[in-house]
C-alpha cells in the first residue's frame, strides 16, 4: 500500500564553514545524507529533528529556521512510499562528541553510520545520494553564493 513518508533533516554548518554529512548502511545499501530521519506519529517536526540528532549523533541541537520542503515527487528508495522531506538549519548546543571521518563510507567495524565535515567551498550535489538532499545542496550553495 502506498503512503506518505514524512522525513525531517538538519543542515548543520560549523564555525569552519563545513556542513555535517552522515554516511550510512541500511537495507543492503550505502548512502550519504544530512542527519535526520522519519517523523513519528504524534511528533512535531522540530521535536522529531531534535530526537533524530540525539539518536544519530548523541547531540542536542537548536533548530534555527526552515530551509526547504520537498516540492517535487520523490519515491522512497526503500519502499513504495512518497517521501516528503523538510529541512531546517540547525546549530549544536555543545560541540559534537563524534569521531569524524575524512572520507565517505569509512565505517568502523561495529557501526553502520559515520559522520564527516565537508567544506562548503568543496561541497557538490554528488556528495549525497538522494535527489532531495542534492536539491538542498544546490540551494545552500546559491544562498551562500559559492
Predicted features along the sequence, with ranges:
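Conserved N-terminal beta-strand and adjoining loop/helix that marks the start
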Residues: 1-19, 64, 85, 89
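A generic structural micro-feature
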Residues: 2-4, 31, 78-84, 107-112
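Short loop segments at secondary-structure junctions
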Residues: 14-17, 25, 91-96, 120-122
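Conserved Nudix-box catalytic region and its N-terminal flanking loop in Nudix hydrolases
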Residues: 17-55, 59
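Nudix hydrolase/Nudix homology domain
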Residues: 29-32, 98, 103-146
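Internal catalytic or translocation cores that form aromatic/hydrophobic pockets or channels
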Residues: 50, 67-72, 83
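A short coil-to-beta-strand element that immediately follows conserved catalytic motifs
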Residues: 59-69
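Active-site-adjacent beta-strand/loop module that shapes the phosphate/pyrophosphate-binding cleft
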Residues: 74-101
Amino acid at each position: 500500500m502506498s503512503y506518505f513518508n514524512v522525513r525531517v533533516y538538519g543542515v548543520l554548518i560549523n564555525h569552519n564553514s563545513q556542513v555535517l554529512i552522515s554516511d550510512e548502511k541500511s537495507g543492503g545499501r550505502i548512502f550519504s545524507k544530512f542527519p535526520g530521519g522519519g517523523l513519528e506519529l504524534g511528533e512535531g517536526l522540530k521535536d522529531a529533528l531534535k530526537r533524530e540528532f540525539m539518536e544519530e549523533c548523541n547531540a542536542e541541537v537548536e533548530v534555527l529556521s526552515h530551509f526547504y520542503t520537498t516540492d517535487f515527487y520523490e519515491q522512497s528508495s526503500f519502499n513504495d512510499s512518497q517521501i516528503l522531506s523538510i529541512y531546517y538549519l540547525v546549530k549544536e548546543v555543545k560541540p559534537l562528541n563524534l569521531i569524524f571521518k575524512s572520507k565517505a563510507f569509512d565505517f568502523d567495524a561495529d557501526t553502520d553510520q559515520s559522520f564527516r565535515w565537508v567544506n562548503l567551498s568543496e561541497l557538490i550535489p554528488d556528495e549525497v545520494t538522494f535527489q532531495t538532499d542534492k536539491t538542498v545542496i544546490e540551494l545552500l550553495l546559491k544562498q551562500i553564493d559559492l
